[in-house]
């Protein structure tokens, strides 16, 4: 090997080693802060975990209580948002993938959907406040909070459904249509079955996303210190209670905020892991 080749080889090895070192340092840097955040969350939230947390409502200052009404309110609004947003998102994604795939309208719809996907959640909350809350006499409610969350669920489900249906091999469509099956029946019985894991993954990721949203609920659900099961009345939610209690001077409220944050983090982690596991186990072949 000539001197020039040896010099070039050593230079490449040095650059490679430097790049690997920088990458490892960057990964460790991010991992360090992730572990720090999780440790802080566990150390401050774990002491407040108990039966009272899930069975008692939010207490007055300096008194013991729980977050039962907040858990219930969040569950109600998330469930309503998923129930309303999922069928609309699947229908829109199906149209994009199967009916309007080559039209100019579909390109516009995808562009608008991408904008909605990246829109700040507080803007969506203000939109629902202007569109619905103000026209009902400024009446905050769980339903208006769910409507705000629908606009977060919708673009996620639309994008996921569109992508998953387009991943289904074209041979499956051709085989079904060659048997004389109508297109709508082919979509329901063939495409949806093949893409069901991916679509369900998108729904679960949307659920994980809306579970921790605070900003859109400030202008819609507003919050409630008491137990309420009426979806047309103000209702408590876990993110709103955490926001209020974490900034308060009362240690009992701060402990509840940390405990609620821990429960929410564990829930989102489990939902995200479940969604990714489901997707990995049911990959759609590209051939």
Swiss-Prot record:
**One cellular component term from this protein's GO annotations in UniProt:** plasma membrane
Mode of membrane association:
Multi-pass membrane protein
> Matching InterPro entries, A to Z?
MetI-like (IPR000515), MetI-like_sf (IPR035906), Phosphate_PstA (IPR005672), Phosphate_transprt_permease (IPR051408)
Q: Where are the transmembrane segments?
A: 22-42, 70-90, 115-135, 138-158, 187-207, 255-275
Which Pfam families is this protein grouped with? BPD_transp_1 (PF00528)
- ABC transmembrane type-1 domain location is 71-275
Compartments it resides in: Cell inner membrane
Per UniProt, which keywords does this protein have?
Cell inner membrane, Cell membrane, Membrane, Phosphate transport, Transmembrane, Transmembrane helix, Transport
Q: What is a biological process (GO) this protein takes part in?
A: phosphate ion transmembrane transport
GO MF terms here are: phosphate transmembrane transporter activity
The highest taxon in the source lineage is: Bacteria
- What is the role of this chain? Part of a binding-protein-dependent transport system for phosphate; probably responsible for the translocation of the substrate across the membrane.
Q: Which family, according to UniProt?
A: Belongs to the binding-protein-dependent transport system permease family. CysTW subfamily.
Protein name as it appears in the record: Phosphate transport system permease protein PstA
Upper lineage is: Bacteria, Pseudomonadati, Pseudomonadota, Gammaproteobacteria, Lysobacterales
